[in-house]
Amino acid sequence: MDSLIRTFSNAQSSRDGYQLAQTLSPDLPQQQLQAIWKSCGHHDAQNVIKRGIQNSTSGFEKLPKDEVQGWSDVYLAYWKAIGELLPALNQAPQSSWTKVYDAWKELLSALYRGYIGQGFEAWSIPCLYVVAKNLRFFALKADEERNNNVAAGDTSGQIFQDDFDPESEQNQKLEDCARQLNRIFTLCLNDRAPLEESRKWGIYYIINLLFKTYFKLNSASLSKNILKTLSAYRGDMPPLSAFPKSQQVTFKYYEGVLCFLEENYFQAEEHLTQAWSLCHKDAMKNKELILTYLVPCHLLTTHTLPSQKLLEPYPRLQKLFLPLSNCIKKGELHAFDLALQQGEDEFVKRRIYLTLERGRDIALRNLLRKVFIAGGFEESKVEGGPRVRRTRIPVAEFAAAISLGSKQMLETDEIECLMANMIYKNLMKGYIARERGFVVLSKSGAFPGTGV
């Protein structure tokens, strides 16, 4: 405890929030955690901690009485949390990650009270980062432990009730964690202090934790409420560019994914591209996550495919996208359907299945383009003039290509419907002359963006 109090004193004198946050970390060597736990007992912990904090700040500007009490409550809660954490780490009998979570939640509540009414200053907000981040980790551990116990038939911790639904409590602690993080979000957002000493500087870290939590709970839509609230307060906020790049990247990634899930692909591409450009060159996992959504976005917004060079550093993305890309490029409809089917589980898991399914339109466009090119040229109507591509294509030729490509026999009406859809989506320029059984294509740019 003496070592911890000394670090607290140094952090207070230098106003170093990150050094202060390390005194609340559970990620210390077990030997160090054990030493903190054994430094006092239940009967004297409160007095030992309070006396240590009072004495530690006597050499410089003394902390106000309320703030001393606030930090004493925080470190008492931390000491109690260590008492639950050590048995859980050692898998001792009667230990429980639920107990760890509940004790750590008390630590976060003590910090919250410190900022609300005991004078904690904004420079110390990294303490919120460390405690909030680990609250989420302990929530995941507690839910995992509980679900494993239920699967093993141990229901001793459950209250028996007729309508008990095991699935409703699978993420019980993580859902509670989301509520605690929301309190911290509001704590930062509603700070009315001048910006240079405002808790608003902690808001994007907490927002990013909330995004991760909501996505883990499969409640991504709740993230939109955060964005709406943030938008309403944006005039009172520091610009995003003033925050650490790591926080900018994470925020832009989730903002892009949310737009992606709402099928707002142009905005999604904009946010994801910003995240990609800000991402550190060696953060390969983060870049892979960004590309998971940026590649399908780009496919729909620009009708272009990822290059082999782009995907080369990411074997998992190659496995995901290259089979589909090859089928789209060659206009192979049946092979595209098979590749989509084979990767369905992974695509659904990553929430990109429906978007990639639309890539079939690009494959169909490339197939129809082949028919157009194979049609060759017509002699110019002007003597000596250059030959021009045949632009009046019989529907039957397109029908034959589509039937061969998809390995399905389609009726003429279905073919015409597909063609009309391509024209409507501006993947092909022209019109259908039904009476004559022709598709009349534009003489300039029959297939926009393809150079034909």
UniProtKB/Swiss-Prot annotation:
Transmembrane segments: none annotated. It holds the Pfam family PCI. Gene3D superfamilies: Winged helix-like DNA-binding domain superfamily/Winged helix DNA-binding domain. PROSITE patterns: PCI. Residues 249-446 form the PCI domain. One of its GO terms (molecular function) is RNA binding. Belongs to the CSN12 family. This is Protein CSN12 homolog. The gene is csn-8.
